[in-house]
Amino acid sequence: GKKYTFKLREDAKWSNGDPVTAKDFVYAWQRAVNPDTAAKSGYIMLDVKNAEKINKRELSPDQLGVKAIDDYTFEVELDNPVPYFLDLTVYPLFFPLNEKYMKEQGEKFGLEANTTLYNGPFVLNEWKHEQSFQLKKNPSYWDQKEVKLEEVNFNVVKDTGAAVNLYNTSAIDRVGLSAELVDKYKGQQDFKTINDPTVFFLRFNQKNPALANKNIRKAISSAYDRDGIGEVILNNGSKGAYGLVPSDFVKGPDKQDFRKENGKLSKVDVKEAKKFWEAGKKELGKDKIELEFLNFDNEESKKIGEYVKGELEKNLPGLTVTIKMQPFAQKLKLEDSGQFDISFTGWGPDFPDAITFLDMFITDGSQNKMSYSNAQYDSLIKKAKQEGSDVKGRWNDLLKAEKILFEDAAIAPVFQRGRSILERETIKDVYIHKYGGELSFKWASVEK
């Protein structure tokens, strides 16, 4: 269907005592699609009626297909049926906002603990930027009797060794491990590996004449060992990736895992890579090719970047790769403005459907960023976004679209992320989510 009616709980309150009402949802959704807001994830809401036209400034935000029927009834109309619409609503972009409070705070909203409003089990009590933050139990929360923890403290520690020392001295209860520490702690009872549906890959900017050549892209895709990256460099449960949609993420109508069903679409074969490379150079009339590799500025990415550079330069004669490491925000800016040749990047799901990965690469899509375009791919994705009833047909369209992406060697997969952590056995019921918010502490407790 195209119409959804949500009944809100009447006992939900904001942390300042205001009730949470349907108007808060109307305001939040209109704000999200308003082009003046420039919401990074605004595209996720474009299936709501008129959202696209509002985003293009053809209609005003109050024309969005959302209505407060009364204080506790919220109605949503879509442009066309979206099979995964209810899954979308757990994404933070769809959360309500208190208009009066936001307008009082103006530009300061959300920048400090005391310029933010809450309606969940915890409130942000203290926030020392780049150092630490503290959650405290929210006394206004409708279900606070279920919340067992009084507070949750987070430390921002960039050096993993220092963070593990804090764990070993009982100063913290949970810590992530880097590759070199995994083997040391693997045998401990508090060691855990978490499967993460986030996939890292190389984006090829086709504005670069060399990367506009399919043989060159295929050569690069086939010339580096992914399993080595997952098992040796990362050593934390990460696995080499051979497609875009991760494994253990979504199952089709016949209960088959998407990744299993579509198989390995991007193979590593140095012999083949050399053939593609020579063919590409010949087509370009070039013997030497120089490419810049845009990378994150953390330790892990640095190792991966250097490894990929080494493999590519060794296996593809005449190639020179220069690595450019950038802080996260600056890297995003360069990607958004197309100022890169190859970019090492990652994507995690916004909702549990393969389209959350595949939708990225439609022509001129806000997450495409690399001038990739294939009309057949576009039409399969468009169809899959609108197909509500033919579940099997839709699944097959998504499988087909992913195959096209790799026939074109539009991107080159690197690894699917795993995480190794130490977590005290006294900690119970911290829930880890594959999409939406990462962790839920509502039901968590610490056993004495």
Question: What are the functions of these language-model segments?
Answer:
Residues V48, L78-V147, E151, G161:
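Gly/Pro-rich hinge or "lid" segments in bacterial periplasmic/extracellular proteins
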Residues T5-K7, V20-V26, K40-K100:
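Surface-exposed binding/hinge segments that line
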Residues T21-A28, D71-E77, G120-P121, L149-E151, ...:
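Alpha-helical secondary-structure segments
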Residues I421-K448:
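Long beta-strand-rich cores associated with HINT superfamily self-processing modules
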Residues K239-A279, E300-K303:
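Structural transition elements
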Residues H129, W277-P349, R419:
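Ligand/substrate-recognition segments at binding pockets and active sites
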Residues S266, G318-K333, D359-E425, K448:
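Extracytoplasmic/peripheral linker and loop segments enriched in polar/acidic and small residues
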Residues A113, P139-K184:
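Ligand-site clamp/hinge motif
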